[in-house]
């Protein structure tokens, strides 16, 4: 039985003793042979102990660690589906995701998430002991895995207020890896680190899976730590590094940054949001090129790349489409628009998701004749460079995390003392953006009580930083809240205060 998508089996045959993974904290290293052996053993363990089979779902609630890559290897071999879940979410949020994905097994890290109190019925097992499978040797696990079989369900916050599970197939991972390698010159000699969380596509699929697909080496960090990251870049002599502007700003503000030589980096990849020109120049002054790009969970995610030589000349651009990515910019009637005319950005290619888990309506609404509708307004200039004019309608990005106001509003409106609520993103010096909530009270309640309530029901990054009470929320003729005008008025009054 042939499984084309078993990457670790292939590399275990080509370069068995090459280091594929290194844990930044403990220094533990894993070769491609060890990963392949462990992935086989885990596959048999999951089948024999839990009767898991192709198509079954496993949730992972954990900080970054090497065991998650071993489970990824098992998923490639078995055809099971991994469901990474943000360990910063509240119990109610996690229960919704577990129920929606119908996971039968939940693996968690004891130090980062307390599963006690979760009402969802499943088998709960600590993830840490899975690392011991590296000492096992098992025969190759055999299963017919096809390109359209899912390997991930990655949840994104939905505009309806409920998260949607984006299906990731083996085909998507393959073509995203090829696109990334062609754009960023990734090969078996590539060495990088990953500090992006593995509950997002950015953690798995911006660099981690493309580098492992091509036989390179990854240094794994549990979480971002500016000082440790800078130290690792130097000590490991990395080829490239990926981070969001907030991370790069924190690194650049370290006292030792100015005296540290990082000119050996081929480039730094920037995602999540646009990088300010002064920050670009800080890295350029250290002879480190900057590669900005654009991506979405539903499409790979790596879609475009701005070559480092254009970083300042085309500042604000997301670059040009990657090799096997097709783009259109369309008007409201789905007609193609000429250069410099803003319209909705549509994407096509083999790295586009087949749809959302158990959500045919959302899947249908997101596509048109094979094109994925990003919901982002963009334009293409005369040279073919793309620019995002506006993000998805109301979403804001706080420290690299996408926050959908309607999700926060849904929680706020469940409180008996709140009659109306509007949330939007406002500038924040450290996190890029944070949330501001305008509240119409039904009963007496303080901003501190609202914040405490949110902390119990939402991830910390979703909790509004500013809470203001108003008498009423203005609405348009159709009864809809005019968020754009409301935010504009709020910002003007805030600036004048």
Identify the function of each model-found stretch.
Residues 29-33, 151-175:
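Conserved AMP-binding A3 loop
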Residues 238-243, 252-313, 326:
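Gly/Ser/Thr-rich phosphate-binding loop
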Residues 45-89, 402:
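Conserved AMP-binding/adenylate-forming
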Residues 174-191, 199-240, 250, 254:
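Conserved AMP-binding/adenylation subdomain of ANL enzymes
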Residues 111-148, 162:
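ANL superfamily adenylate-forming
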Residues 304, 320-324, 335-366, 401-403:
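Conserved ATP/PPi-binding loop(s) of AMP-dependent carboxylate-activating enzymes
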Residues 44, 68, 89, 349, ...:
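AMP-binding/adenylate-forming catalytic core of the ANL superfamily
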